[in-house]
Amino acid sequence: MIVSWSLKDAVVVVVGSGKNAYRRVNLCLSENSSKIFWFCRSSADGGFDVGHLQLDAKKSDAIEILPISEFDPVRSLTTLGKEETDFLVDAVFVSESNHHEKEILHRTCKRYRIPLNIIDNPSLCSFTLPATWSEPPLQISLSTSSNGCRLAQRLLRHVVSSLPSGMPEAIERFGRVRAITKTPEKKQWINHVSDFWPLEKLVRMTEDDLLAIVSDNFSLPLSSSQSSSLANSYESLSTTLDKPSLTLDPEAFPTHKRGSIALIGSGPGSPDLLTVAARKAIMKADYVLADKLVPEAVLQLIPRHTPLFIARKFPGNADKAQDELHQVAFDALSRGDYVVRLKQGDPYIYGRGGEEYLFFTQHGYVPTVIPGISSALMAPISAGIPVTHRGVADQFLVCTGTGQKGSMPKIPSFVPTQTTVFLMALHRLEILVQALIESGWPRVLPVCIAERVSCPDQRFIFSTLEDVVEEYNKYESLPPGLLITGYSCNTLRNTA
């Protein structure tokens, strides 16, 4: 278990010499410990072997350097502390793994409940130090639970190297905006940006960009494609306004002087599950308009020079966000841009794709529609659930867990041989489950919660209808997710 522990104003004992001892002393100094008793070995010149501390912190009044020969594993720990702690010290660090009195130290610290860390002796420690990287305000700690500190350091370097440049400064900007954002609703908007928007985009956002997110009337300031007017000219896919354009030729994604737009399904999350047509369209786009739930791995396929606008569809702001998105699209279309409207899953399965198709068509722009793999289809496959199976399920139904304007949708009748998938349901899971039970659905019906399907951190929680809420509440949510119900949930699990 990793916890954040403060050593501010603490009295700490450090035993040992060399760089490991120095690091622990420096750690205590950075934590503003009030007093550090450093029991140190002598150096070759007769002084103390304090390493780099000679150059900086040696003069600090917080440090008292003592010969290691004066250290007593009982007396030193029970007399050097503050009066308010009955003279017990607050923590002990031992930087020598073969210290001859480490067993006595362990028993003493255990008796007096003094936190103890002995390097390379996890069985004698009451706490261990994780591998830590810090560039304020960002701190990252990683632990292998005492199974390999060198491996932990290597893994930490890998994690840190994957961070976009400028992440600490971006966190500071987020902190300032959160501090001046007063309403809970707008703070939730900021949380959604933190949860769903690509990190590469977050580090490029200014404080004004963040303030625009919580503004009621201000569109996000985004750079437009300066070179779109010089883009190659393509033949129009369709000039007919009375029928959808559903051409899947990967080379046929045109722009003309009036601009053109494509509604594209980005699939459940993995870039590998994008259609070839969708990939080609993304690469050729002059402007991309994306839903907030489109995973970062998919958004990373967008060329860096292509402007990206992410819809501000936060709770309570969906309609305004849709209007804003339309305006951004029209601005790009009026420049002659080829606009890609990137939607999670499939545009026509609870993606408002039909509404957007009608809207743009009525305004003179007939969208190309490129389907995507819906999570309603992908989630059961990833979870090992055959939505139809001879003798178990011969029907498949896709429903929403959230009706228009947040209302409860009509609950379908229970059919024993039917697999039902509820999209947009997990944020109101308890209400939905109660409605299903009240409508006669069996309490013991097998169910599965699927989250972030096809992403590296995908998760599946199997349960029954009556227990799924309690089971789900044991975990932090990983949106987007959905609920799968039906006896097919256990078909393959029972044979495993």
Swiss-Prot record:
Molecular-function GO terms, alphabetical: uroporphyrin-III C-methyltransferase activity
Could you say which protein family the record assigns here? Belongs to the precorrin methyltransferase family.
Gene3D superfamilies on file: Cobalt-precorrin-4 Transmethylase, Domain 1 (3.40.1010.10), Methyltransferase, Cobalt-precorrin-4 Transmethylase, Domain 2 (3.30.950.10), NAD(P)-binding Rossmann-like Domain (3.40.50.720)
What's the source species for this entry? Schizosaccharomyces pombe (strain 972 / ATCC 24843) (Fission yeast)
Name the record gives this protein:
Probable uroporphyrinogen-III C-methyltransferase
Which reaction equation describes what this protein catalyses? Answer: uroporphyrinogen III + 2 S-adenosyl-L-methionine = precorrin-2 + 2 S-adenosyl-L-homocysteine + H(+)
GO terms classed as biological process: methionine biosynthetic process; methylation; siroheme biosynthetic process; sulfate assimilation
The record's listing under InterPro entries reads:
4pyrrol_Mease, 4pyrrol_Methylase_sf, 4pyrrole_Mease_sub1, 4pyrrole_Mease_sub2, CobA/CysG_C, Met1_fungi, Siro_Cobalamin_biosynth, Uropor_MeTrfase_CS
